[in-house]
Amino acid sequence: MLQQNNEQLLNLLPDKMMEKTFNPTDIEQSLYTSWEEQGYFSPTGEGDSYSIAIPPPNVTGSLHMGHAFQQTIMDTLIRYQRMQGKNTLWQTGCDHAGIATQMVVERKIAAEEDKTRHDYGREGFIDKIWEWKEESGGTIGKQMRRLGNSIDWSRERFTMDDGMSEAVQEVFVRLFEDDLIYRGKRLVNWDPKFHTAISDLEVENKDKKGHMWHLRYPLANGAKTAEGLDYLVVATTRPETMLGDTGVAVNPEDPRYKDLIGKQVLLPLVNRLIPIVGDDHADMEKGTGCVKITPGHDFNDNEVGKRHALPQINILDKDAAILATAEVYDTKGEVCNAYDTGLPSEFAGMDRFVARKAIVAKFDELGLLVEVKDHDLVAPYGDRSGVIIEPLLTDQWYVRVEKLAGPAVDAVKDGQIEFVPKQYENMYFSWMNNIQDWCISRQLWWGHRIPAWYDENEKVYVGRTEEEVRANNDIAADMKLRQDDDVLDTWFSSALWTFSTLGWPKDTEDLKTFHPTDVLVTGFDIIFFWVARMIMMTMHFNKDENGKAQIPFKKIYMTGLIRDENGDKMSKSKGNVVDPLDMIDGISLEDLLQKRTGNMMQPKLAKKIEKLTRKEYPEGIEAHGTDALRFTLTSVATTGRDISWDMKRLEGYRNFTNKLWNASRYVMMNTEEFDCGQSSPEGKAGDMELSLADRWIIGQFEQTVKTVHEAFDTYRFDLASQALYEFTWNQFCDWYLELTKPVLFKENEAQQRGTRHTLVNVLEALLRLMHPIMPFITETIWQRVQPLSDFSKNGDSIMVQAFPQFDESKCDQQAIDDLEWVKQFIIAIRNIRGEMDISPSKELPVLLKNVNDNDQRRLDENEQFLSSLAKLESITVLADDEQGPASASAVVGDLSVLIPMAGLIDKEAELARLDKAIEKLEKEAGRVRGKLGNENFVSKAPAAVIEKEQAKLADAESTLAKILEQKIQIAAL
């Protein structure tokens, strides 16, 4: 009898085992709700701990294929370890996503209320964001449930919740007290639209058609080049920044200019004397060999400036317009008087690109414009604002990371933290060994406000609260303090993710139990922005009972990117984004077109995307269910490589779920109302007799268990999926189920009982083996199969059962060898049928030659299997000297299998049919050869198209060779 709690799950699964196809929409959402309500996702408190912290998705986001891919891997690991008896925690939560969230809400109030954030003021606008989060911020959580993620939702965190805010403040204050945080003026990526510094990850570099301007800079004090010229020609793609030049670099080995090093040029328009410096940054082979150096508006120039102590001049305001008066700083960002701050008044207030035209025109007017060349360049754009980013000198807060980087490098070097695959360690070391101080301030309203206050003299005080600042510094209540307006970089709070979500800075039981986490599953693109910073922050703030720095995770599993079928990156602007929920539930063509083009402002692009979508999905997208999607994702999870999404693969794995479903229907129909051996628990001798096929499938299953364990333990989810597919489809369904039919239709109760017992027990264990990847279908079938099996359950859901363990004693090598021989014998007969176009249902006489003792034993023991599955009329063993009639033949080991052809085929008709097939294939092969021999086609066609044509030719030639061989055989009859 099923237990009462188990009935709750069964009630969700209407008795549909006899339906021909599995319909995932019938059960997925209700089954997930039941799992969640019954608390199966929560830690049990028993066993060794195993934990994963999810990379927190943006609160503004919705599920994309990258999320689906990584989360399927994480859930597979969590379910696997839970079934291994571990005390599992999958910690989830969302990131407040500073700039992205602020932008979403700004757009919302502009569209709905015709207001800006300034109309609300800072506090009012932040209230609007919290309102928006309550209404819309949970979308991604609902979508994650659809993936089957076994997350303990009661522990969900948000990077702006009270506990996280406390942790962020604590970290900032302690770092400041340790002299690891400072405020300084340095060059940052400045977004002139959003008026904030942004990280490198938020900069999108795009190819762009531009120009290279060659400008003449007069040499000062009568200096001349080796060629006798009294000027240098500099080449630049950004002539507007020349107003901020503080040097000209030449290569110290360049014979044209090396004697000028230490001399000066008179900078046109501003009449500023600036030095000529020797630096390898100047390439003798590139441009004119002379490079203008603008430390205040170019990152490379800034490094050159530091090497040669060149002042930094800022010529732009926060809107990237020309200032009336320049700002001059030394290399440390301190104000200095190295140069006059005057700028030409005619350019003041001009946008940088308007100023570019005006400055070029002025150079032309003065006879200082040498030439303008077309030039392909890469320009940095804000990924959200869409405007060109400006390197700008601004006051920002920074973390001194050099001291933090050392232990973080050592943790990977000494094996405390392991990258999977290992090759990513080199990328990590490369970045860590050249690490720059981290700019952590952002000029936004939404985020963790920097816990720093200023008095009327701009002296800065850092503390957890204003009250603490006043108390620690004896500041009177009537003395006004102003809190810093900036907020912290989103990556600052997410760098604390693994330990802050477990209650730090308090010393909680969760922190002791689940930290460090076991594995981080993430993409290589954020090794620097998140992974490295998590390691640095965690090791600085967390120590074990012996005072040793604690790591955030033991392993880092790096995934590749999911790309479209052509290998291109998925993006809304390309219209090639695949929504995982559309793969699960299906979507009509009309709805898909609306989703991809509905909000597009560019009609031409929308038209192009519509055409592409109609071609790719003429009927829309069919529903495939969550299990098929998850199995597809694990099957392509080769370590670290990018993946081209393939709808055909997804369709293939939907067919796989149907195959499993139908196999289970067969098992249930042949066992549910019958004695499967479980009625004799004392196991009396003679109760059950296992056939060769039973012993073979049990051994094959054990080998599959071993392979899946090894694959999961080494993060080779692709190999685990491959092993499960191979066993389920090819061995269990295609062979074993067919081999059970002769036994089940015989009148031998012991053999029938043995086969039924094997059917239910192998299927039950197979469902547990597959469950981490395919949770829904396995739970559904397991609820019905388990009561028929020997397996003693622990709890009511498959997810809390024991994962199968490899048992070598169940691997009967002789049974495996014998059954493989039986399979090869049957395949040989089937191949002859196929080659000779003989009906599969026609019973055939078979003659055998070269039969050894082992072959004879196998024939005697398995005649029932051979006759049934190969559809044989008779099996005759020929004497050694006996010649058989004209026959089609095949070889199984040393054994020759002959099928006499007399009376089986119409020789002339078959030869005529083969001649037609040969003619057709020769034409096709000739056509493709001609195409591939066409130089014009080969030079212009994409590599994928050429590969497709080459595959066509190989297929045609292979088939042609087989048919020609077949023709020779038939002609000889």
From Swiss-Prot:
Coiled-coil regions listed in the entry: 901-970
Positions of ATP binding: K572
Domain notes: ValRS has two distinct active sites: one for aminoacylation and one for editing. The misactivated threonine is translocated from the active site to the editing site.
Name of the protein in its database record: Valine--tRNA ligase
PANTHER family: VALINE--TRNA LIGASE, CHLOROPLASTIC_MITOCHONDRIAL 2 (PTHR11946:SF93), VALYL-TRNA SYNTHETASES (PTHR11946)
Motif annotated as 'HIGH' region, chain positions: 57-67
Organism in which the protein naturally occurs: Colwellia psychrerythraea (strain 34H / ATCC BAA-681)
Gene Ontology annotations for the cellular component aspect, listed alphabetically: cytosol
